Amino acid sequence: MAAARVFRSTALRQFPVIQIRRNATLGTSAHGDVINVQQIPAPGAGHIRVLLLNRPQARNAISRQLLNSLGKHIDDIKAEQGKGPTRALVLASNVDASFCAGADLKERATFTKQDTEAFLAQLRQTFANLDELQIPTISAISSMALGGGLELALCTKLRVFGSTSIVGLPETRLAIIPGAGGTYRLPRLIGKNRALDMILTGRRVSGAEAYFLGLCNRLVEVTPEEQGKPGEAREKVLRESIKLAQDICEGGPIALGQALKAVDGFERGAEAENEAYLGVVETEDRFEALKAFAEKRKPSFKGR
């Protein structure tokens, strides 16, 4: 196996230092405390919304309450249509042991058949809405992401893993299959053969192998000493994820949205790229970039 490129956590240059309180809420969510929220200033204007899953007693398993809360946050961002104050989204955990353990099987055991069908429909729609957001989205994972937890991470555009991460789709070992997008989002990301290996065996994949497979975009080194300190790995991966979001948000908001559209439509080739290019070439941001280049200064983008 080729050696993974490891990103060592660095200071957030040119931006406010972000203090992350370990094992503590980062503000109160309007949608309930199963998700804690922080808004980080983005370069120029707007903010990066950080959502921290917070069900420590259930390893962030997806309950009705958690799904409702997550869905409302995603709906809020979707309503902005890429033109609001939310420049990027980082999805992370407020729990050391797990990013997300998938479905809440204890709660699921109480469901009727109709309850299960309704829950799955809501889960799939929420994940689809996340997948379709018109802003950069990042999952920050430093621990376990299994089953629906990995399927959730597959819905974001980018993923930052710690070297301590363990991910997988173990459903076939439970006599079912991934049911929230894993069977098509995973092969779309890493290819059919590699996806079949993970899905058919149900095996767990380390952070290093996930990077090798193309499952994550960044791999953050967590030392044994850091791993032994509560919150250290989680904080380190979250910082790298926020830094990535800040770096991305240095770009023009319209250009970022059009780039996402173009890459999402890559199978159409030049047609998708040309359509997206027409959406940026005559914008105020584009003219500001040209002017700033001539004047040897940093551009000030307005999202227009």
Locations of the language-model features?
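Conserved CoA-thioester-binding segment of acyl-CoA-metabolizing enzymes
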Residues: 2-92, 128
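Acidic, divalent-metal-coordinating active-site segment for phosphoryl/phosphodiester hydrolysis
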Residues: 203-209
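C-terminal long alpha-helix characteristic of the crotonase
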Residues: 44, 160-165, 216-272, 278, ...
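Short helix- or helix-capping micro-motifs
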Residues: 101-103, 186, 194-203
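Glycine- (often His-adjacent) and acidic-residue-rich active-site loop
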Residues: 85-86, 92-128, 145, 175
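Glycine-rich beta-to-alpha active-site loop
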Residues: 126-174, 204
